[in-house]
UniProtKB/Swiss-Prot annotation:
PROSITE patterns: AA_TRNA_LIGASE_II. Its main location: cytoplasm. GO terms for molecular function: aspartate-ammonia ligase activity; ATP binding; catalytic activity, acting on a protein; transferase activity. Gene3D superfamilies: Bira Bifunctional Protein, Domain 2. Its EC number is 6.3.1.1. The gene is asnA. This is Aspartate--ammonia ligase. Coiled coil: none annotated. It comes from Lactobacillus helveticus (strain DPC 4571).
């Protein structure tokens, strides 16, 4: 847990003004996202049955919040979602979406094992979206075009927020640069993946870091962990901004083209979890029963934090924080909700 305390921090908005700005950002951005990406708002679950394999296993070590239900057998464990990465692809089929059609949801999750800092909370709120593509569109061009559309939605939201709250909006970069995790390792082999991200974000201001999950050539280790059963590790990435108030990068979106039957087999083998292939969701992919798709998540609280120049995500969402973090934040004029 690393807490960054910016020197001489003074919020420019009161708590009530901040809350009003949060509402405006959320409503504005989701309208922009729906229009620019061509996706439809859909209702989504907060929990799923463990046996379906629909929950996001993240890096494979995080424990989901799990419980049983009075109306179901005790052995049928229910889990609060970590994300809706797999559910969305299934929903595209279930609800009859066609080529280049898609959905977005308001996703709320609990990640009990999250390492807490200025950007990370156990409460996760994001716009989760998913869109059907053709198999031949599973390529880098499709990925980069989609990233630029999401960035356009963010920039258009920034402009409107700035007009509404002049002097209280953080100025973003004007374009997205693209780089792979291997290119980062080749350029800075002696730095950690996190340090490389900070370096490239500071240089470029806005960068999409591609190909996350597979082992890198020099270190033999992944740049970062990714579950093997939703993103194709060769066609995914993170949208990262340089955030001057904290002298740090901030990840706003993780997204990617989803696994095909071929890449699912390959990635399950690399991750040493081939037993997952027996789960219903995975069987549908392997049998070609689910549409090819691209999708991702966009952090709601993080976007609000970024656009409003806040020092801690707890200024734009209500969560629980360790007592020592609360005390340090109070001493630095950071008011956690």
């Amino acid at each position: 847990m690393t807490l960054i305390l910016p020197k001489d921090y003074r919020p420019t908005l009161t708590v009530r003004d901040t809350e009003a700005a949060i509402v405006f950002i959320r409503e504005t951005f989701q309208d922009k996202l729906a229009s620019i990406l061509g996706v439809q708002r859909m209702s989504a679950p907060m929990f799923v049955e463990q046996k379906t394999g629909l929950n996001d296993n993240l890096n494979g070590v995080e424990r989901p919040v799990a419980f049983d239900m009075k109306a179901m057998p005790k052995e049928d464990t229910i889990e609060i979602v970590h994300s809706l990465a797999k559910w969305k692809r299934l929903a595209l089929k279930k609800y009859g979406f066609g080529i280049h059609e898609g959905l977005y949801t308001n996703m709320n999750a609990i990640r009990r094992d999250e390492d807490l800092d200025n950007f990370h909370s156990i409460y996760v709120d994001q716009w989760d979206w998913e869109k059907i593509i053709r198999k031949e569109e599973r390529n880098t061009d499709t990925l980069e075009i989609t990233v630029n559309k999401i960035f356009r939605a963010i920039k258009e939201t920034e402009k409107l927020v700035s007009a509404r709250h002049p002097g209280s909006t953080y100025r973003l970069g004007d374009h997205v640069s693209f780089i792979t995790t291997q290119e980062l390792e080749d350029r800075w082999p002696d730095l950690s993946p996190d340090e490389r991200e900070n370096q490239i974000a500071k240089e470029e201001k806005v960068v999409f870091i591609m190909k996350i999950g597979d082992k890198l050539k020099r270190s033999g280790k992944p740049h970062d962990g990714r579950a093997p059963d939703y993103d194709d590790w060769q066609l995914n990435g993170d949208l990262v901004f340089w955030y001057e108030p904290l002298q740090s990068k901030i990840e706003i979106s993780s997204m990617g083209i989803r696994v095909s039957e071929e890449s699912l087999k390959e990635q399950l083998k690399k991750a040493h979890c081939e037993e997952r292939a027996k789960l219903p969701f995975h069987q549908m992919i392997l049998k070609g029963e689910l549409p090819y798709s691209i999708g991702g998540g966009i952090g709601q609280s993080r976007l609000c934090m970024l656009l409003l120049g806040k020092a801690h995500i707890g200024e734009v969402q209500a969560s629980i924080w360790p007592e020592d973090m609360v005390e340090k934040c109070e001493a630095d004029n950071i008011e956690l909700l």
